């Protein structure tokens, strides 16, 4: 029994020692376990950890991720040297950022539990906004926090009536009643039918076309210059005014240049013809009272008087 084979058999039977192989993790992942069974893994430092079935199927994760996920859980027994070195680094990162990972995990878990318990209110948008406001309230600063605080009063101000119809409060309706009312204009407009049915003479006076060329100060405007829309009564009034003006001018002229000697009977005929010559313009042209015109008229009268005297002799 002292040979090498006997000693090896005796050691396997009476002193079993488990030596961890480098690929033991793959062996654990490949084994098929039942739902309620758990596997106890023995490490080199005699630390036992219970691993459920769901954790065994996720063995594709790296060692660093598995160690980071179990930092917040209590450990049984001493940790390996690598874990003890990485744990202070994680704690330093949490202190630098100002937010611990455990606090964020707890807040997320509490929000999920609250949503599961209140499943009936989860579908409404108002509850979603209120929950988000309570979760994000510590992180809001300045104007964002003010806007979030003003959200609830505005929602309370609106009144829901019927099947979701919103109505403004009574104060807004009272303000709307004070809007000034502008009455309709009293004056007739250009496109109104009252202007179309107006008197034709007034309409002609309103829409009278004035000539672009302004007349001279000493000459009265002609009838043709007043436009084609002037009625017959206005034309007759203009003609009468022109005739009266010409007769007054001629009468004043003959009074100033009265005859110094008695004229024969033939002069009366010439005098009757002269006004027709001066008054021949019926369109309102007024004779200018210049010195040259007066001299020409005097010479014409003298010539006609001499011819009449020769005929009488």
From Swiss-Prot:
The keyword Cell cycle does not apply. The modification Phosphothreonine is found at residue 104. It is a peripheral membrane protein. One of its GO terms (cellular component) is plasma membrane. One of its GO terms (biological process) is regulation of cell cycle. Interacts with KEAP1; this interaction prevents the ubiquitination of KEAP1 by TRIM25, thus protecting KEAP1 from degradation. Found in association with PDCD10 and members of the STE20 kinases, such as STK24, STK25 and STK26. This is PDCD10 and GCKIII kinases-associated protein 1.
């Amino acid at each position: 029994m002292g040979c090498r084979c006997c000693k090896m058999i005796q050691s396997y039977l009476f002193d079993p020692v488990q030596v961890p192989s480098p690929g033991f993790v793959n062996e654990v992942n490949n084994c098929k376990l039942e739902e309620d069974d758990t596997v106890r893994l023995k490490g080199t430092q005699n630390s036992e950890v219970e691993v459920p079935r769901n954790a065994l199927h996720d063995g594709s994760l790296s060692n660093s991720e598995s160690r980071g996920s179990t930092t917040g859980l209590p450990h049984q027994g001493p940790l390996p040297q690598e874990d003890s070195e990485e744990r202070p680094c994680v704690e330093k990162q949490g202190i630098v950022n100002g937010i611990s990972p455990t606090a964020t995990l707890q807040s997320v878990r509490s929000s999920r539990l609250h949503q599961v318990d209140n499943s009936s209110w989860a579908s409404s948008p108002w509850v979603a906004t209120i929950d988000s406001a309570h979760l994000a309230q510590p992180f809001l600063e300045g104007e964002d926090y003010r806007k979030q605080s003003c959200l609830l009063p505005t929602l309370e101000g609106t009144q829901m009536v019927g099947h979701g119809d919103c109505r403004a409060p009574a104060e807004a309706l009272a303000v709307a009643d004070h809007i000034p009312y502008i009455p309709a204009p009293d004056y007739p407009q250009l496109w109104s039918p009252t202007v179309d049915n107006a008197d034709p003479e007034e309409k002609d006076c309103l829409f009278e076309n004035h000539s672009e060329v302004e007349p001279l100060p000493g000459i009265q405007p002609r009838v043709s210059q007043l436009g084609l829309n002037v009625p017959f009564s206005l034309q007759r009034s203009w003609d009468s005014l022109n005739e009266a003006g010409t007769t007054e001018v001629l009468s004043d002229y003959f009074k100033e240049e009265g005859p110094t000697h008695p004229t024969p009977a033939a002069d009366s005929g010439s005098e009757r013809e002269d006004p027709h010559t001066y008054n021949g313009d019926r369109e309102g042209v007024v004779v200018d009272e210049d010195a040259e015109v007066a001299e020409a008229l005097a010479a014409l009268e003298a010539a006609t008087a001499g011819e009449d005297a020769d005929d009488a002799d």
